[in-house]
């Protein structure tokens, strides 16, 4: 029986998919798998028995991904599972930035003369007037699951949509509306668009990508939306752009002391994936990924190892090996297995950056001695037998 530990509350809709072969545990030392949402894991010491971590969400900044790869722990996320929830909040953010809906609601709530509120409203409504988003130009930086959904929905709302993503996947490209215009550079987005929304992961290359130079290239009175990661925007430069009028509104899902309560900035408390549907979708996908990995050794949607799939395990002995992506690894594996008289029925090897993953189906079970020899190979971090 495999055991899993939840570091955060995980939807029972997802956990229910584990079935009787799995047991939830509170002890990290007993866990084969960890499910997590927002818990910080960088200071955690992960025991040898942990084989997989599944993040019920897209971002993995709270997980020591590289350290896990070094120790042969496969880290999954759930790309696209919360995409619709985030998309809807982005669309709401554009509307809130275009029409002073929040200001109007607050005025009604705090107006003391409620008896004559209907007449007062007619007099005061002009101060909350705004503009429509239909006919405006929207620039989308990053056309992954969320960005693509925002793009398609915005076209249905009558917006002229421009997309920039030099790394767009084939699947994402197929799902995009034909009306979306392809921008070849960020400068095209900056110079043409009335609204700009960011949908890229946080990396060393994207950290503070929206900086002072970027703001100088944008249209006067642009609306900027950030529902991806807070550190994508240089907020010191943002404040300058707001004060100068270059940026009309900044809408973000990431509260911090610099932006909270500041005029011209609308901040939500990280609500992007805070819907019942998103939480269920993320939990379901995470549990399915964990089960397929533990039961079959397959990897899909890992952030530190390559996708690798050999289907349902029907072999007498299936071995999975996490190892460094260096020469002469496969030959060492096959030499050890061959010397034990073990015949390989099927095998696949995939690599991603510095790490690789190998699945081997044997016609008979490997001995403990053979497994120990595999584990002893320099560059091998974890060897597992699928039973």
Spell out what each predicted region is.
Residues 42-45, 166-259, 274:
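Rossmann-like adenosine-cofactor binding region
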Residues 136, 143-144:
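Glycine-rich Rossmann-fold phosphate-binding loop(s) that bind the pyrophosphate
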Residues 147-148:
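N-terminal Rossmann-fold NAD(P) dinucleotide-binding loop
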Residues 250, 263, 271-387:
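NAD(P)-dependent dehydrogenase/reductase Rossmann-like domain
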Residues 1-78, 211-213, 223, 234-236, ...:
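An N-terminal-biased, well-structured beta-alpha scaffold segment characteristic
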Residues 71, 79-137, 301-303:
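Phosphate-binding beta-alpha-beta segment of Rossmann-like dinucleotide-binding domains, i.e.
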Residues 87-106, 152-159, 285-298, 334-338:
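Oxidoreductase and adenylate-handling cofactor-binding alpha/beta cores
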